[in-house]
Amino acid sequence: MGEYERTVFTRRITGVETEYGITCVGDNSRRRLGADEAARYMFRPVVEEWGSSNVFIPNGARLYLDVGSHPEYASAECDSLSQLIAYDRAGDKIVDQLAQRAETALATEGIGGRVYLFKNNLDSLGNSYGCHENYLVSRDVVLKTLGRQLLPFLITRQLICGAGSIQDGQFQVSQRADHVWEGVSSATTRSRPIINTRDEPHADSHRFRRLHVIVGDSNMSETTCALKIGSTQLVLEMIEAGALSHDLELSNEIAAIREISRDITGMAPVPLKAGTSMPAIEIQRRYAEKALCWLEQRGDTEGTPNAEMHKVVSLWLDTISAIESNDLQALSRDIDWAIKLSLLRRAQRRIGCSESDFTHPKLAQLDLAYHDIRAGRGVFPVLESKQLVNRWINDTDIEQATRIAPSTTRAALRGEFLTAAKKLQAPISADWLRLKVNRPEPQIIELTDPFENTDDRVDQLISYMRNHAASYSTDTAIS
């Protein structure tokens, strides 16, 4: 384990990429827009304001249309758990505002229609789209070696943070479990692994790697999201520190992830490479109990404070205990799949279905409506507004995160640069690493350390734009 002892990130750069499902329901007999056309209407204001449908915005995030006309929001670099949840939720608000503007444009043009955005991972045809987690790790880490200790956790993690789904008339804990085909791979779509190893650190490649986890479900619940990200951060810390001594490697990772998704009790035995087997929920308990011990020696440094991590571990252990005792009611305010299942159970009773029958169309409608992000319309937003589910952060944090980049990471520099460029209508381009002023003479800098939130070179770029503001035309594209 010596290879992990050199760097333990208790302050870790983390980000989440969310692809949203989109559909447009026309008014009465008017023509219905396809998803691709609805997405183009939605991104019209983005193109008008920034000159592209693939942009970085002043809160530090990337906003773009992904393959298959899925609006995608990639959060800015965050270095604490609550910060990340705020910027993830900010993405929901930003894309929903675009959807509402699209509805206004459709009405103005006499087309009409309601644009629906779903924070889920499956469409009605069974196509899967993702919620990708990004964790900064040291270049010292060999991802395939790390994967051997991380995969048992990620495969069983769906029990504590799955979004729940009806597939083929059956309830499953996870929406993504049936749509991954490898444990660790450099592919993303063709074979779709649990951990993607493509080497794109978006930082100094001599110092950092980006661990790209693509197996997770999109979460509506803040507490579920906090448990998903917080538990993973703690497991990574323990792996880096050499604090995980047990061997829980699974004999067949893909068979296991599918079987676990179909067993809400978590008690189905999972075969291990060692030749024994263990219930999935027991594997989670092993990790959670190790995390509780780890917190005693972790140290309260920058990033997510120990008090918040203790809150994560407490929720983690409580969730495991509730699943072990089949007390799903205890999870019905905190864990997405259990919240959804409790709603489906009520609907089954109203319809007259048995608890094992999920074939009724109204259940599928409820399954989808749970993920509608529109306040006052989506099922989960209504639960949240009625205080029927628990929160991790508050609305003020989310609103601020829609406008201002995280102040503690590199994103602050990008946000400051983009805000100034927008005000000055300067011709610029930006990505995760680079900031560029295109004219009069190209000026470019690279920000290779995602932990740094100050840099004199950014101040110089902004001064350069101000000095040449008179030469910038009003139709300049910002990309």
From Swiss-Prot:
What would be an example GO MF term here?
ubiquitin-like protein transferase activity
Q: Which UniProt keywords apply?
A: ATP-binding, Ligase, Magnesium, Metal-binding, Nucleotide-binding, Ubl conjugation pathway
Keyword Glycoprotein tagged: no
Recorded hits in Pfam families, A to Z, give: Pup_ligase
User: Pathway listed for it?
Assistant: Protein degradation; proteasomal Pup-dependent pathway; Protein modification; protein pupylation
| Annotated ATP binding sites | R62, S75, W432
Keyword check for Metal-binding, yes or no: yes
This entry's Enzyme Commission designation comes to: 6.3.1.19
Which terms under GO biological process does the entry name? modification-dependent protein catabolic process; proteasomal protein catabolic process; protein pupylation
- The reaction(s) this protein catalyses: ATP + [prokaryotic ubiquitin-like protein]-L-glutamate + [protein]-L-lysine = ADP + phosphate + N(6)-([prokaryotic ubiquitin-like protein]-gamma-L-glutamyl)-[protein]-L-lysine
Q: Which InterPro entries match?
A: Pup_ligase, Pup_ligase/deamidase
The family this protein is said to belong to: Belongs to the Pup ligase/Pup deamidase family. Pup-conjugating enzyme subfamily.
Reproduce the miscellaneous comment text: The reaction mechanism probably proceeds via the activation of Pup by phosphorylation of its C-terminal glutamate, which is then subject to nucleophilic attack by the substrate lysine, resulting in an isopeptide bond and the release of phosphate as a good leaving group.
- Record HAMAP family: Pup_ligase
Q: What does this protein do?
A: Catalyzes the covalent attachment of the prokaryotic ubiquitin-like protein modifier Pup to the proteasomal substrate proteins, thereby targeting them for proteasomal degradation. This tagging system is termed pupylation. The ligation reaction involves the side-chain carboxylate of the C-terminal glutamate of Pup and the side-chain amino group of a substrate lysine.
Protein name as annotated: Pup--protein ligase
